[in-house]
Amino acid sequence: MALAGAGSQLRTLVWSACLCVLVHGQQAQPGQGSDPGRWRQLIQWENNGQVYSLLNSGSEYVPAGPQRGETSSRVLLAGAPQTSQRRSQGGPRRRQAPSLPLPGRVGSDTVRGQTRHPFGFGQVPDNWREVAVGDSTGMARARTSVSQQRHGGSASSSVSASAFATTYRQPSPYPQQFPYPQAPFVNQYENYDPASRTYEQGYVYYRGAGGGMGAGAAAVASAGVIYPFQPRARYEDYGGGGGEEQPEYPAQGFYPAPERPYVPQPQPQPQPQPQPQPQPSDGLDRRYSHSLYNEGTPGFEQAYPDPSTDVSQAPAGAGGTYGGAGDPRLGWYPPYAANVPPEAYVPPRAVEPQPPFRVLEPPYLPVRSSDAPSQGGERNGAQQGRLSVGSVYRPNQNGRGLPDLVPDPNYVQASTYVQRAHLYSLRCAAEEKCLASTAYAPEATDYDLRVLLRFPQRVKNQGTADFLPNRPRHTWEWHSCHQHYHSMDEFSHYDLLDASTGKKVAEGHKASFCLEDSTCDFGNLKRYACTSHTQGLSPGCYDTYNADIDCQWIDITDVQPGNYILKVHVNPKYIVLESDFTNNVVRCNIHYTGRYVSTTNCKIVQS
């Protein structure tokens, strides 16, 4: 009986506990509808193979008006990953700094300019589903609100809190410092003209770095603390009043230029005929010498006046002070200022044409032979002299530069000697016609001895331009014996003259060499070599030919002992233009004994 009574009491207690739990649950049902934690809305979407869910505990529509402090809503973003890979603790988090309210900026404007991007660059308002269009107070309140607490981490890695979704609609503990009205949110598909951006005087602007600096700046701003960065200079600081004030100096427009009056070009005055040059007292012909020979010479300027110094002036009645104003290329341009007096146009000095464009009278042609040519030959030689010799380069008349070859007489005098060699060792030189005519006779053998007068040669280009070969590059001749190209037919003439009569006693030859910069003075660079495409002689450089190379000689096998004159002539036919042709010849006195030679009195002469 006792056990039966105890069992019945135990059953009674169990049923009483269940009834209490049931009654308590039924009493909690009426308040469930007002639970702020209840999820009322669910939005799902898929991105990159992952399904996301947006849960909202608030109502879908919020009426316009002041926000009630006792109500709050929660927004939760949940993602369900498709793969089994688990992320770090807390799941993926979106970090986004709340935007600061900028006066005059539309809600959809981006930082870069007026271009509207649909919900891009973090410019979407936080309450885009809760604030009605046209409610400026709600927009300002939503944009200035700062998140105070975040949703705690969930046990599931697929549920994460968003920076903009975990904001509780609670009143801020700090008073709002910037109650400026904001422009309402504008639909991104609506055609509108964005308002011009202006800056207010009383507003304090803050600058924040990327990341969470924006949130920190907003929190400090809401607390009334000035951020420790200097504000950027506003447009008003430079004198611009938002477009209301006119600038002190208006912008200069484009106005048509006034027409230039036409003035006929003055007719050139006839030049007087040059008088014949007075005969110099020393007997030297200086018509083709450098200009330094004529400086300070009385009577030279009168005999050969400079046409560039005689500038014809316009007549007084032909347009006043406007010289050649009809043509912009030749005339006068009006000044920009109206009060500046016009200046007369002064034409540039006429540049003296370089050879062979200018013809001098009387013509002059150096004669290599002692025999006087005929009358017709003089006429033909005069025409040839006009084309080949040309004028002298004068650097004071803005003309182009020309080379100037000068042989070294001391170099020739220091190393002249006699050599005897067998004909079989001179085969390469024989191919280039560097021997006397008796070496090519049928009775000549390889064991015949040839007597050679050897001497070196060093030529300097002391002009202002490169001395280049006259032959085109594709016509240069290749010599297999010497293994180089010959770029000129006649670079130098070597002659042996009789000291008493001046007649040529040894057959000179036409030396054809390849041009190169052997050595250069200090400050000049070597730019040419004896190759197939870079032959020439630079200014300030020397082309040196030692006495032991082929063809650097005169064959004197048939010459008797005696006194002679060695003549070395550079650029003998004046094929390449030079600024001075009077310094191309070197003469030396030679005393030949039959076994050796002595060289004296080497100097530069005219011919």
Curated annotation (Swiss-Prot):
It catalyses: L-lysyl-[protein] + O2 + H2O = (S)-2-amino-6-oxohexanoyl-[protein] + H2O2 + NH4(+). Belongs to the lysyl oxidase family. Residues 258-279 have a biased composition (Pro residues). The lysine tyrosylquinone cross-link (LTQ) is generated by condensation of the epsilon-amino group of a lysine with a topaquinone produced by oxidation of tyrosine. The record marks 95-96, 134-135, 151-152, 217-218, 370-371 as: Cleavage. Keywords: Cleavage on pair of basic residues, Copper, Disulfide bond, Extracellular matrix, LTQ, Metal-binding, Oxidoreductase, Secreted, Signal, TPQ. PROSITE patterns: LYSYL_OXIDASE. There is a cross-link at residues 510-545 (Lysine tyrosylquinone (Lys-Tyr)). Disulfide bonds join 428-434, 481-530, 514-520, 541-551, 588-602. Interacts (via propeptide) with EFEMP2. Interacts with FBLN5. The keyword Coiled coil does not apply. It is found in: Secreted, Extracellular space; Secreted, Extracellular space, Extracellular matrix. Pfam families: Lysyl_oxidase. Its EC number is 1.4.3.13. It comes from Mus musculus (Mouse). InterPro entries: LOX-like_protein (IPR050912), Lysyl_oxidase (IPR001695), Lysyl_oxidase_CS (IPR019828). The modification 2',4',5'-topaquinone is found at residue 545. Cu cation binds at residues 482, 484, 486. Residues 82-91 have a biased composition (Low complexity). This is Lysyl oxidase homolog 1. Residues 1-28 form the signal peptide. Its cofactor is Cu cation; lysine tyrosylquinone residue. Residues 403-607 are annotated as: Lysyl-oxidase like. Residues 29-95 form a propeptide.
